[in-house]
C-alpha cells in the first residue's frame, strides 16, 4: 500500500509543480540487493518442484452478500492450490534471467508425485545430497507449496457509466533453500503478491462474461507466483523514475539538453554553476536536487544523499513548513519538500543496502 501511496504523490507532484516550474522525468535502472546472501563458491543451483501432483482445481467460489446502494454488483472469493509445476518453471526462468548463478538447472516434475494426499514436506538431508549430486549443483531451491486466493468482482463505475469485471489473485508461494551440508533448510520464504485483470462492459453480465477464463487465470497466476521469490534470492534490476528541474535559468535549460544527449558531466557543471551563482533558495534547491540525481547516475550514492539533503533543507525554507512538526501539511502546501523528501528516502535506502549488494556481487569482482 505504501508503494502506491508514493506513486500517487509523484503524480500529484507533476500536477502541482508543472504549472509554475519545469520538471522532466527520466528513467533509471539500478541493482537492488537480495534479502539472502550466498558465498561466491555456490555457483550452480537447481530449482525443484517438491510437491505432489497438482490436483485438477475447480474454483469453488463463496459469494458475498452485497450491501444495498453499493456500486458492487457481485463479489465471490475462492481458495485453490496453484500449479507448482508452472511456478517452478517460472522461478527457474526468472533466476536464470538475472545471470547471478553460473548454471540454473530445473527439475519441474513433482518429487512427491506418489503421495496419496497433497501435503507440504521438507527434503531430508539425504534427499538434498542425492539431488545435488544427480543434478551437479551446489544448492537446491525448492517450490514446496502454492496457495491462491482469487476474488472476482463486478462493480458499476458511475464516472464512466459502465461496469467493470475484475479478478484479483493473491499468490502465496512457499520456497525453501537447501545446502547439502546442512541437516535442515537454510531458510524458508513465504512471500506474497497480487496480480490483477479487468474488463469492462455496458452491463454487469457483459463485464462478467469478458473476465479472464479460470483456466487462463490459474496459469498466469502460477507463472506470476514463480517470480515473486526471486528478489529475495538474487539481486534484481529495478526501474525507477527521477525528476529534474529544467527551467528558471539559461544554465538549467542548457543542462537539460546535455542530459538528453547523455552528457551528464557537462550537465553537472552547469547545475553546479547555477547552485553557486544564485542567492535564490528556490534555484539552489532545484540545482541541488539535479546534482543529487547526477551523483546517483554516477553510482556515488553518499554524495547523492548529501545533495538531496541540501535540496530538502532548502525546500523546507522555501515553503516555510516543517512536515515533521505540522502533520496537517499537504502536498499543496509543500510540494517541493515532498518531492525532495521522497527522493532522499529512496537514496538513503539504496545507500544503506550498498554494502550488502557489494558483498553479494563480489563473485563478479564488483563489476556491476
Q: Predicted segment positions?
A:
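Long, contiguous interaction/recruitment modules in multidomain scaffold/adaptor proteins
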Residues: 86-95, 101-247
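Short secondary-structure boundary/capping segments
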Residues: 2-3, 61-64, 157-158
Amino acid at each position: 500500500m505504501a508503494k502506491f501511496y508514493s506513486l500517487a504523490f509523484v503524480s500529484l507532484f507533476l500536477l502541482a509543480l508543472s504549472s509554475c516550474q519545469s520538471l522532466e522525468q527520466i528513467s533509471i535502472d539500478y541493482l537492488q540487493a537480495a534479502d539472502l546472501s550466498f558465498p561466491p563458491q555456490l555457483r550452480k543451483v537447481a530449482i525443484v518442484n517438491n510437491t505432489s501432483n497438482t490436483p485438477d482445481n475447480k474454483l469453488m467460489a463463496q459469494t458475498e452478500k452485497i450491501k444495498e446502494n453499493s456500486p458492487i454488483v457481485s463479489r465471490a472469493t475462492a481458495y485453490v492450490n496453484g500449479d507448482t509445476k508452472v511456478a517452478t518453471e517460472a522461478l527457474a526462468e526468472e533466476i536464470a534471467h538475472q545471470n547471478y548463478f553460473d548454471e540454473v538447472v530445473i527439475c519441474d516434475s513433482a518429487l512427491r508425485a506418489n503421495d496419496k494426499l497433497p501435503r507440504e514436506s521438507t527434503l531430508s538431508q539425504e534427499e538434498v545430497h542425492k539431488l545435488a549430486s544427480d543434478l551437479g549443483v551446489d544448492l537446491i531451491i525448492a517450490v514446496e507449496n502454492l496457495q491462491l486466493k482469487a476474488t472476482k468482482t463486478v462493480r458499476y463505475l458511475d464516472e464512466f457509466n459502465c461496469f467493470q469485471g475484475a479478478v484479483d489473485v493473491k499468490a502465496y508461494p512457499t520456497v525453501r533453500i537447501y545446502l547439502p551440508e546442512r541437516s535442515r533448510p537454510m531458510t524458508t520464504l513465504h512471500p506474497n503478491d497480487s496480480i490483477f485483470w479487468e474488463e469492462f462492459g455496458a452491463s454487469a453480465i457483459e463485464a462478467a462474461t469478458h473476465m479472464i477464463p479460470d483456466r487462463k487465470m490459474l496459469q498466469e497466476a502460477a507463472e506470476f507466483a514463480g517470480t515473486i521469490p526471486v528478489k529475495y534470492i538474487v539481486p534484481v534490476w529495478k526501474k525507477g523514475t527521477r525528476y529534474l528541474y529544467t527551467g528558471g535559468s539559461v544554465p538549467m535549460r542548457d543542462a537539460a539538453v546535455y542530459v538528453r544527449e547523455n552528457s551528464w558531466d557537462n550537465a553537472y557543471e552547469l547545475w553546479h554553476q547555477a547552485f553557486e551563482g544564485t542567492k535564490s533558495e528556490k534555484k539552489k534547491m532545484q540545482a541541488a536536487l539535479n546534482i543529487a540525481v547526477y551523483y546517483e547516475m554516477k553510482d556515488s550514492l553518499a554524495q547523492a544523499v548529501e545533495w538531496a539533503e541540501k535540496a530538502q533543507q532548502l525546500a523546507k525554507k522555501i515553503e516555510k513548513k516543517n512536515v515533521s512538526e505540522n502533520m496537517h501539511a499537504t502536498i499543496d502546501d509543500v510540494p517541493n519538500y515532498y518531492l525532495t523528501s521522497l527522493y532522499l528516502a529512496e537514496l538513503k535506502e539504496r545507500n544503506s543496502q550498498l554494502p550488502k549488494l557489494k558483498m553479494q556481487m563480489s563473485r563478479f569482482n564488483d563489476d556491476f
